[in-house]
Each structure stands twice: as C-alpha cells, then as structure tokens.
UniProtKB/Swiss-Prot annotation:
Gene this protein is translated from: ppk
A Pfam family reported for this protein in Swiss-Prot or TrEMBL: PP_kinase_C_1
Name of this protein: Polyphosphate kinase
Organism of provenance: Nitrobacter winogradskyi (strain ATCC 25391 / DSM 10237 / CIP 104748 / NCIMB 11846 / Nb-255)
GO biological process assignments: polyphosphate biosynthetic process
Function: Catalyzes the reversible transfer of the terminal phosphate of ATP to form a long-chain polyphosphate (polyP).
C-alpha cells in the first residue's frame, strides 16, 4: 500500500447515524482530569500488589506521588487560571472549571489518604525485612551521637535559620520546597518568634545510620527528623514551642509570547518566571500547631481549598531514594536487554542490517544501544554526508548528542531540531542546543506555536554514485535511560519513499513549508488526524457492508472528541474495537446503544507502556497480513493532533508487520496479570484470566521470547512462541 487510497470500499448501505441526543450529550465523555486520577489510582494499586517485591512497591508509591505533583503543577494550575480569569466554558463532558476543581479535590483527598495508609503498611513491611525508618524519639544514645556528628559536618553548613519579623519577612519558597516552621520563645524573657528552616534540596532525604554489625537492620532517619534533634544549635537561646513541616507546589506552566526575536532568551526568562509561579497546593503536617499553620498559610496566600493536612510523610515522591539501598532481594530480578542478532549477523554494521530489510527494535527488551550505534556509525562513516535529527528529551551526558557533535566536527552536514518546549526539560534542551552549536551543528528550534514531538532521524549516505537514505522513527524519546524502563518501538528502514517523506517532514519544520506530497507517512497537524479518522470510517463501512471490521489501538491517552465519536459510530456499525490505553481515556466503553463493541484495557506493570500503535483490519479478520499497521509518536489527544508536529509511519515489511501486529499487539491484548479493564463510569477493575485460561504476563513474555524482525539468521533456529487470543479460537457468532 504505497498510499492511503482505498481505505474502504464505496458505501453500499444507508448511513447508520448515532441518535442525535446521544451524540450531543456531554455524558458520552469521561472527564479528562478524573480519568487521569483513575490512572494514577491504578499506579498506586501496584504498591499493594503482592506479586511485587517490597522496594518495587515503594517505587510505585513514589511514582504515584510524583505523578500527582506534576498533575497539580500543570493541570490543576491551568484550571485554576481559568477560574481566576472568569472562564466558564465547559469541558467536553459538560463541567465548568470550578466544577472540575471540586471533583478533583474530592478525588485527590481520597487518593492522598490512601497513599499515606499504604506507606504505613509498607513501612511496617520494610521493618520486617530489615529496613527500619525511625523518628527522633526512636534514636538510641549511640545513634544520636553519630547523627550529631554527621549533622554538624554535613547538614549544618547547608542550613540557613530564618527568623520571621518585620526586618526579616517571609522568604520565597520554591516549588516542591520542603521547610520546617517553628514557634520559638526566647529563653531570657519568653518573647515569641516564628522561624523557618529550609531543607536543602541537593542532599538525600534519608540518612543511613551505621549499624553495629552487618547483620543488623538498616536504620534510617529523614533529614528533617535529624534536623529537629538539633534545632537548639540553629537557634541558641530559644525554646521550641511548636513545629511542623510544610511543602508547596507552584504553577509550573510556561507562558510564551507569540512574538519573539530570540527564542532561547525568551525561554530562559520564562523559566525564571516559572520558579516564582503562584502556589497551587500547600501540604502541611497535620501535627503542626493550628496557630503556626495559619501563619504559614497566610504568608503563602494559600486558599483553604489549596491546603492539604498530611497525617504522615511529606514529599512522598522522595521515597524512591529507598530503592537505592543494596537489597536486590527486594527488587525485580535485573533484566539485560538483547541486542538484535541481525545487526550482529552483519558484523555490527547497522546500515547493512537495515539494507537487508526493515527492522523493528522493541525496547526495553532489545537494547537502545542499536539507536546510539546507528548515529555513531553515521558520525564516523566517511560515506555519510548528512544527518538530520529531532530531539525532544534525552539523557544527561547523552550519547546521541555526542554522536551528532562528532559528526559535525567530522565535516558532515548535521541538523538538530531541538524542542525547547519539552516540559521540565527546557533548561537541559537549551544546554544541549548550545553545546551542539559550538560543535558546528545547525540547530533549529521549530515552531513557536507547535511542539515538535516527532521522533525522527534521517541519515543520507553516498552509495554507488547516488544518495541513499536511512531512517529511524520511533514511539519514544532518544533517551537511553528511559529506554530501559519504557516500552517503545524503534523502526529502521532504507525504503526511499520513507526517506523522502522524512526529508519533507524536516523541511516542513525547518522551512515552514507545508509538504503537499508526502507519500506514506502522515504528519500532524496536517494529515495525521484525517488519516486515523479515514481508517476508522473505513472500518465502519466494511462493517456495514457485512465484512470483517476491526480497530486495534495502543496509546497513552485517548482524549480527542472527534476520534472518540468516530469510534462510537464504528461500534454502532458493528466494528470490533480493542483499545489499550495506559493513561487518560475519555471514551466510555461498553455502553449499550453507544459503545457496546468497544473494550478498553490499561496495562500497568514492571515497564511503562509508552508505544503508540494503530491497526485497522481493512476488511479482513484481525490480526491478518492485510491489516494497515502504523506506529507513531502521537497519542489521540487534541494537543498531539492539532498543536504538535507528530509522525505516523506505516509498517509494510511482512516480518515487521507480523511482529508488531501478531506479537506485540496480541500480547498486549492477551495480558491478564498486569491489565485493568476500563468500566463505563471511568473506573477500572483488575483483569483475571478467563476460566480455563493460563494467566499471561506480556512483560515476562517479551523478556523470554525474542522478536521476529531482529532475529536475523537465528530465526531459522528458533522463533518466539506464537500467541493466540481466546477470541481467535472461538467460532464467530
């Protein structure tokens, strides 16, 4: 299929429109913010999963807390801004910003309470396996002596005691800043004074106390707990009358002016403004005296509905530091990614492996090193004349950046499109941009009004008197660290048509010229939305004409109303719709008369499901060789379809097509051990294997079964276990 022509046959039956009242009702959508909170609930549930080792359960708890922090910094901050501006426009599900805030606060209150309850259970569990977290009152005499010495030499120099009075006003507290508030009385005359101690942000939260012997339990105390033992050293001559910790979250959205002469300088200024964003959430220890609590709230101008009293630990995201303890018995068994055998068959020559035929690399089961190797080989190959590369997020000391710099220093034409608007990575991306420019790379920042989220690399090589192109496109970032824990797909091809399409995408980004002649790829905000809609409508037509019709989609989020409505219409026509949505899903599945043919599941497990795959039956039974199969950087959200540059790439090589459709998608649909079924009300329930079925864990399957396209000669000796779904073995109704 060289183009997108003939997605569906001509309509032969009258259109079956959904009832107009149902189509117009906002109740057909689940609220985006509440759906996200349901997703974070699923993450939190992994912290009570008895199948996970203890420290992995702590990790899931910390992830759920970190997720919630970012939700407030971005989503809640945006809704609060709408309320301040008097905006009453309703969300697709019919709620005003104020109504959404009420529901968010109710849901978050329950979620935060459950996080603390789970932590209390996990803390007891850790104590049972030799990891004990102690409070100041639990410190022994010998431990206090060691803590005192450590405090004096390693913590005391970092602390600045701050008295609060007319000469010393309440200081600025940064977002996520952790602070101890104090009520003090001068020993000499009893004069009261309020004071603060800011906890330093560059040292570990948990202090490990040396054990008497290697067989003794590990005992840890928080840095604030250690500091509380020695407040008299910070405020000599004062007595502590009351104290408590607090933590704030600030608005972290960036406001960028549309007219800007220097984009980098503009972002640097905006980042400075972000650090001083308004307070969105104030977390206060419940044990803090009421008078001191009121003082802190008043000083930070926090409204009552922005204050959360915490009966437990603050900054729960920092519990992830506990996973650094050397206790492999309490963690997942380490997994070492495979390297594609086909690359080894060619002596490590990535270009030769790609020339043989297209290749899909499935991360993290297959190493991201092959992507790095692709660019390193391009940098050192004298026949490579040009490299074009997008960068949205990458790692510290990035080998991707080093390879691009090396190529430029070797005299090759290198263009790097760096997205400055990658949230929370803006400063790092500015740094990479300057480093690359110094190396001679042509750095481009793309569109001011659009984020460039596409994952695309184009290498141009001189071969036999002409130029050949090698393309990498994927579903995940060029980030070696996250590639070890995110499941993503890397697609390599030397197909000249894909090469031309990739070149046109780069020209669009660097030259602003809209491409009118892209042959196979689809690009947002230009054609990607319509390509997906055309396919869904095509399957709808197949169903109405009595042919097999199916839509399989895997993504991180499904929010776009037009896509959802098209899926509803497909369901009404009898299309079988299977959706794997890790996070937000605004579609209501299984509603009679609306979506009874739509099933939605979410996979939450050891690895973070991140790949986007879109499959359409094309009038044949799924999975089948004639299906249209795509991978993409885009989720089905308005921001991806309308406000970002994204790429949707078809997979046409038979082996690659089979691997993605019949191995990866089937495994995701088959999974029962890490899957949740989305219910019509937006909540979800854990899936279980059907009666007579063996439980199936897709992550375990891919850790123990090699891929198809990367096997090379080894495929003749052994191939991955073929997967079948229960529905495939049942006769059609």
């Amino acid at each position: 299929m060289d183009s997108i022509q003939a997605i569906a046959p001509e309509e032969k039956k009258p259109e079956l429109e959904l009832d107009s009242a149902i189509r117009a009702s906002p109740e057909r959508f689940i609220n985006r913010e509440l759906s996200w909170l349901h997703f974070n609930r699923r993450v939190l549930e992994e912290s009570v999963n008895p199948g996970h080792p203890a420290l992995e359960r702590v990790r899931f708890l910390s992830i759920s807390a970190n997720n919630l922090d970012e939700f407030f910094m971005v989503r809640v901050a945006g809704i609060k801004a709408q309320v301040r501006e008097g905006i009453t426009e309703r969300s697709p599900d019919g709620l005003t910003p104020s109504e959404q805030l009420v529901l968010i606060n109710e849901t978050v209150s329950d979620l935060a309470s459950d996080q603390q309850a789970i932590w209390r259970d996990l803390r007891n569990m850790l104590a049972g396996v030799g990891i004990v977290l102690i409070d100041g009152k639990d410190v022994t005499k010998a431990e206090r002596s060691w803590i005192a010495d450590h405090f004096l030499h390693n913590i005391f120099p970092l602390l600045t005691p701050l008295a609060i009075d007319p000469a010393h006003p309440f200081p600025f507290i940064p977002s996520l800043g952790f602070t101890i508030a104090l009520q003090l009385a001068r020993t000499s005359d009893g004069k009261p004074m309020n004071a603060l101690i800011r906890m330093p942000g560059k040292i570990d939260r948990f202090l490990r106390i040396p054990a008497a012997s290697k067989d003794d339990p590990v005992r840890l105390i928080t840095i604030e707990g250690a500091t509380s033992l020695f407040i008299n050293r910070l405020f000599p001559g004062y007595t502590v009358k009351g104290q408590g910790a607090f933590r704030i979250i600030r608005d972290s959205e960036l406001e960028i002016e549309e007219e800007a002469e220097d984009l980098v300088r503009l972002f640097e200024t905006a980042l400075k403004r972000r650090r001083r964003g308004s307070v969105i959430r104030l977390e206060i220890e419940a044990a803090m005296p009421a008078e001191l609590r009121a003082f802190v709230q008043r000083a930070l101008s926090a409204a009552d509905d922005e204050v959360l009293l915490v009966d437990g630990v603050l900054a729960m995201n920092e519990l992830s530091q506990l996973t650094r303890l050397d206790r492999p018995d309490l963690e997942f068994v380490p997994y070492v990614p495979r390297h594609p055998e086909r690359v080894r068959d060619h002596g490590g020559d990535v270009f030769a492996a790609i020339r043989q035929k297209d290749l899909i690399v499935h991360h993290p089961y297959e190493s991201f090193d092959v992507v790095v190797q692709f660019l390193q080989q391009a940098a050192r190959d004298p026949d490579v004349v040009a490299i074009k590369q997008t960068l949205y997020r990458t790692s510290n000391n990035s080998p991707i950046v080093r390879a691009l710099a090396e190529a430029a220093e070797a005299g090759k034409s290198v263009t790097a499109l760096i997205e400055l608007k990658a949230r929370f990575d803006e400063e790092a991306n500015i740094r990479w941009a300057r480093d690359l420019e110094r190396a001679g790379v042509q750095v481009v920042y793309g569109f001011l009004e659009l984020k460039t989220h596409a994952k695309l690399s184009l290498v141009v090589r001189r071969e036999g008197g002409s130029l050949a192109t090698y393309v990498h496109t994927g579903t995940g970032n060029y980030h070696p660290v996250t590639a070890r824990i995110y499941t993503d797909l890397s697609y390599f091809t030397s197909d000249p048509i894909i090469g031309r399409d990739a070149a046109r995408v780069f020209n669009y980004i660097t030259g602003y010229a809209e491409p009118s002649d892209i042959e196979r790829m689809a690009v947002s905000p230009l054609t990607l939305r319509n390509r997906i809609l055309d396919h869904i409508r095509g399957e709808t037509t197949f169903a109405r004409n009595g042919k097999p019709a199916a839509v399989w989609m895997k993504m991180n989020a499904l929010v776009d109303p037009d896509i959802i409505d098209a899926l509803y219409e497909a369901s009404q026509a009898g299309v079988s719709v299977e959706l794997i949505v890790r996070g937000i899903c605004c579609l209501r599945p299984g509603v009679p008369g609306l979506s009874e043919n739509i099933r939605v599941k979410s996979v939450i497990g050891r690895f973070l499901e991140h790949g986007r795959i879109y499959c359409f039956g094309m009038g044949q039974t799924m999975p089948g060789p004639k299906a249209a199969v795509y991978i993409s950087s885009a989720d089905m959200m308005p921001r991806n379809l309308d406000r970002r540059v994204e790429v949707l790439c078809p997979l046409q090589n038979a082996t690659v097509h089979q691997q993605v459709l019949e191995q990866i998608m089937v495994a995701n649909l088959k999974d029962t051990e890490q899957s949740w079924r989305l219910l019509p009300d937006g909540s979800s329930t854990r899936m279980k294997a059907a009666k007579g079925e063996e439980p199936f864990n897709l992550h375990n399957y891919f850790m123990t079964n090699p891929s198809l396209s990367g096997r090379g000669k080894s495929l003749k000796e052994s191939s991955p276990r073929r997967l079948t779904r229960r529905s495939e073995r049942q006769p059609p109704a």
